[in-house]
């Protein structure tokens, strides 16, 4: 086992060096398009970017920017940060694959044969390198964006739960869980995508704690993981701001104290409750106090108070009462032992919660820097209330998920005083600082209506075609005949044509699942037609294989395309080899007995939650401003695990059907399968090598240099690709233009 650990560490670091070297060689030397210039600027100058911000990314980017020789190399340093983090992501992917394969291949941990060693290392190397050279991950690895950092968090926390699995029965194994919680809290300050790893993590925990796990228990574990995700995403993240806001209102508006007094007192009390709860659950001196301190901490974090206004308070009181009734000593003594909540469980839960809060506290940076009125100060989140709006991304609006209007739905109307009025609802209220009439006037907040939303007369389940601004695009993607619904327009009865539920589902499969997910998936593991953004046309942005008869069936004869499309650098063909390896790997894993099927469900839910679950949540409309494959990198990461396992699956096939010994079979398969990532690298290098791209920087400079040098000229920009390069050039690079 010692020899295995040495080899595993050595090959893992070699994989890291390969990936990091490739990414550092191909980084963009300056800012890229889209959000990159903004993130680089906010990192370098610690300014406030678009909601919901990325404060921990800003802090680490600022650290890397200190290595810049001058302002012109700041972007390069931040891009190096992404490259190194992406290389580290590959390292942890390698170790995750070797861990999972070892569990299925090795029967005696103290006597790992050479054949088993080669199988495990070959699996890790092929899977990790396939992901290294995949289209989506390489794209994010060479630019200053949050997705490389987020991918590293995903890789690390998944690897950590596998490390915990090895030591789960040791006395201090909970420290791995606490470290996962801390990294989860930190990841909130980068991107919320990392929370989607929690179901896979919970399954690993369940399968280790319950060796004879069954389907019912697995479903309950998944339900618990969903509650855990909701507790962080809809509990802690907005809850701390909500309860802190209540304290702020009480101390400022009621007691007449100055701004931020309530927030400071809330932070002190929250810290005190956490420490008290941890102390009581550690000492176990008084069970009633232990439960009380735990529930008080949960309440102070705002986890039970879901929603807005009075309803959130009612929900919170009900949840708190239910927790007390279940956790109180009398109830715990009456229930069966397997349903009891131990002091260790409460203590670990509170420690994990505290670490999440510590990680999440990076958002204090946003308020501090906004108060300093930095040049870029989007939404100006200077107090607890504006921070809540900033975190909630309220400027982006909402979209229906389970029930809501279709694109043709009409606003519900009510007759009032002889006039027709649209039916509207207010989502809570907002509080803003009152402008003082005199310097001696006390600080106070005033209440204003919250976000206003229209109510619609016609609604449907699972609305996928909901945007009235995209009516033509829906019809272009789907042959919509619909059905007529009567609509009373203030006494004038008209018919509204609504899409059928089946047409709605067909759009979900044809556009949202196929075009906006499956197409990206196949880019990475089958091949890509070109890098021109597609909107459904046959010659732009489709996935291909490089196998003529398949491609002819999919998108027509590619030899008939214009030469400029044939020569497009984004034309990459993998002949479906990574896809086939992944399918072999997932089948091999699923059929390796109970341990194999348990592993399969762990990897599957990592794959599902970071892929299809995001598709369901985003509910995207046609004509997106850019390709969205970067959002699903975690799903492709999970599939890379199966690609690595494909090596072990092929070794098994040679052993079973060619009657080969394990060592030669493992050596042959590992060497042969290494040609898959080599083929991927040969195809994707030219379109991912950004080492000589300066277009975004030049674009921003051209905008600024076209302005007059004095007189404070005003410039109007259109969208991300106009605004952010200009902001980067103006705020990061030295210019002589005061805009």
Task: For the regions a language model picked out, list residue spans one by one.
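Start-transfer (signal-anchor) and selected internal transmembrane alpha helices
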Residues: 1-22, 88, 108, 113-125, ...
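Transmembrane signal-anchor helices characteristic of membrane glycosylation enzymes that use polyprenol
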Residues: 5-33, 131-133, 185, 191, ...
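Transmembrane-helix motifs of polytopic, lipid-linked glycan transferases
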Residues: 13, 80-112, 156-160, 580-587
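Aromatic- and kink-enriched transmembrane "portal" helix at the membrane-lumen/periplasm boundary
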Residues: 24-25, 71-79, 104-117, 124-151, ...
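Transmembrane-helix signature of polytopic, membrane-embedded enzymes
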Residues: 93-133, 168-175, 595-605, 660-670
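Membrane-interface transmembrane helices that cradle and orient dolichyl/undecaprenyl
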Residues: 106, 112-118, 157-176, 203-214, ...
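Short hydrophobic alpha-helices at membrane interfaces in multi-pass membrane enzymes
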Residues: 118-125, 167-185, 214-227, 286-298
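Conserved small/polar residues in nucleotide/adenosyl-binding loops
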Residues: 729-738
